[in-house]
């Protein structure tokens, strides 16, 4: 959480780096030790490499943030282009991480169908972050029934 996409703020890549050194890397996808970083941030593409370097295994971004952000691929990068969620998934994979896409409860799930060729994780938060900086636990609703019906699996 960066204080822009959502009003709350939380820790970033430096803290992930410190924690990663105390946790064994997973031996399988989604296995014990997987660092699933759910990025509730305004510029999700900017931070992919930093979180990869920090030890992130699964980089989950919000669809809504991606479509309204620039395509800059580093914190100091500049771009006038908008981020394509489908291209962001490919970029995350090219950096050696699994990709996840989250959508807000108010976003129609249909926006995901064109993106989900090879998803690693799909989730829909059933609550939004609290603007009062209260701790909000996010639970997820399994939306994979739709993609599995469309794409098999």
Regions found by a protein language model. Name each.
Residues 1-41, 50-53, 62, 71-74:
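An active-site metal/cofactor-coordinating segment within enzyme catalytic domains
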Residues 26-31, 46-153:
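Conserved anion-binding
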């Amino acid at each position: 959480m960066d204080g822009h996409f959502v009003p709350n703020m939380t820790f970033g890549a430096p803290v992930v780096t410190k924690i990663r050194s105390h946790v064994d890397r997973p031996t399988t996808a989604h296995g014990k030790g997987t660092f699933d970083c759910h990025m509730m941030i305004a510029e999700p593409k900017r931070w992919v490499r930093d979180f990869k370097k920090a030890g992130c295994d699964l980089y989950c971004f919000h669809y809504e943030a991606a479509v309204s952000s620039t395509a800059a691929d580093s914190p100091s990068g500049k771009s006038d282009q908008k981020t394509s969620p489908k291209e962001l998934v490919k970029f995350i994979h090219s950096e050696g991480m699994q990709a996840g896409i989250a959508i807000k409860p108010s976003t129609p799930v249909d926006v995901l169908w064109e993106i989900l060729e090879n998803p690693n994780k799909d989730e829909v938060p059933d609550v939004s972050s609290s603007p009062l900086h209260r701790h909000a636990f996010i639970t997820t609703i399994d939306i994979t029934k739709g993609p599995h019906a469309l794409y098999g699996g």
